[in-house]
C-alpha cells in the first residue's frame, strides 16, 4: 500500500532504477508523471501517440517502431497509463501482449497505472496487465486505487500489486514507512468500494456517459472546429483547439 498512486510509482521507481536511467512515457499524458520522473532523477523518453485523423474509431495509435527503438536503447522502465489519461483510450489485449513481449526481450519493467479502470464505459473492455499470464507477471507491477472511481482521493490509499516472486522480493526492500503512511480509513474504504460499491459506480458511469455525449453535441453545434473524440473511459475530455488559431501561447 501507499498513500496514493503517485507515491506508489515514485517508490517503485526508487526500487527498480538509479538516477540517470531512462524511462518511457507516451504523451499526451497526465502531467504528474513528469514530476515523478524528475523526483527520481530519471531521463525521459517520450514516444507520443500518433493521431490517425479517423474520428469514427480510436484516433490515437501506438508508435510501435518508436516504442521498440526506446526499449532497445537500454530503457529501464515503461510507465503505462492504462486506461490512458487524458485520452480515455483503452489498450487491447493484443497491444498489451505486444508490450509484454518487448519488455521480456529487452528486460524492461512495465509499471501499469490502472487507476481509471473502474470508470470504463459499457461496450468497452478493460484488460488488467496482470491478467495476461506468467510473462506479464514477470515484467510488470500494477498500481491502482479506488480514488478515481469512487471519488475518495482524500482518504489516501493506493495499492501496489505484483504476482511475481522476484519482483516481490525487490518490492520488499521498499521502506515500511511507505506502507504505514497509507490511511487506515482509506484502506477500509478501498476494500468496501471494490467489493460493494458497484451500484454507486454504475450510477456515476451512467452520468459520465451522458456528459461525454452532451459535450460532443455542444461542440458540434457551438464550436464545430474543435475536435473531440468521445472517450472510452473516465471523466476527462481531450479537446483539439488547433483550428481556433489561438497562437503559440494561447494563455497569453
Tell where the protein language model's regions lie, with residue ranges.
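PLP-dependent class I/II
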Residues: 2-252
Amino acid at each position: 500500500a501507499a498513500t496514493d498512486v503517485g507515491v506508489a510509482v515514485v517508490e517503485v521507481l526508487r526500487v527498480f532504477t538509479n538516477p540517470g536511467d531512462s524511462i518511457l512515457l507516451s504523451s499526451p499524458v497526465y502531467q504528474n508523471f513528469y514530476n515523478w520522473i524528475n523526483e527520481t532523477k530519471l531521463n525521459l523518453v517520450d514516444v507520443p501517440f500518433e493521431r490517425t485523423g479517423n474520428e469514427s474509431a480510436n484516433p490515437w495509435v501506438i508508435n510501435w517502431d518508436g516504442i521498440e527503438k526506446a526499449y532497445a536503447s537500454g530503457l529501464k522502465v515503461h510507465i503505462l497509463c492504462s486506461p490512458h489519461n487524458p485520452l480515455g483510450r483503452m489498450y487491447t489485449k493484443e497491444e498489451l501482449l505486444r508490450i509484454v513481449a518487448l519488455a521480456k526481450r529487452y528486460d524492461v519493467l512495465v509499471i501499469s497505472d490502472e487507476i481509471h479502470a473502474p470508470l470504463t464505459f459499457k461496450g468497452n473492455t478493460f484488460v488488467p496487465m496482470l491478467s495476461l499470464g506468467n510473462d506479464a507477471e514477470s515484467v510488470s507491477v500494477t498500481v491502482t486505487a479506488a480514488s478515481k472511481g469512487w471519488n475518495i482521493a482524500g482518504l489516501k490509499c493506493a495499492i501496489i500489486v505484483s504476482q511475481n516472486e522476484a519482483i516481490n522480493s525487490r518490492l520488499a526492500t521498499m521502506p515500511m514507512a511507505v506502507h504505514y503512511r497509507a490511511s487506515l480509513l482509506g484502506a477500509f474504504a478501498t476494500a468496501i468500494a471494490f467489493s460493494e460499491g458497484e451500484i454507486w459506480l454504475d450510477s456515476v458511469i451512467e452520468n459520465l456517459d451522458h456528459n461525454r455525449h452532451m459535450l460532443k453535441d455542444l461542440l458540434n453545434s457551438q464550436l464545430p472546429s474543435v475536435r473531440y473524440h468521445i472517450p472510452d473511459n473516465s471523466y476527462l475530455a481531450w479537446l483539439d483547439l488547433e483550428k481556433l488559431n489561438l497562437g503559440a501561447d494561447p494563455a497569453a
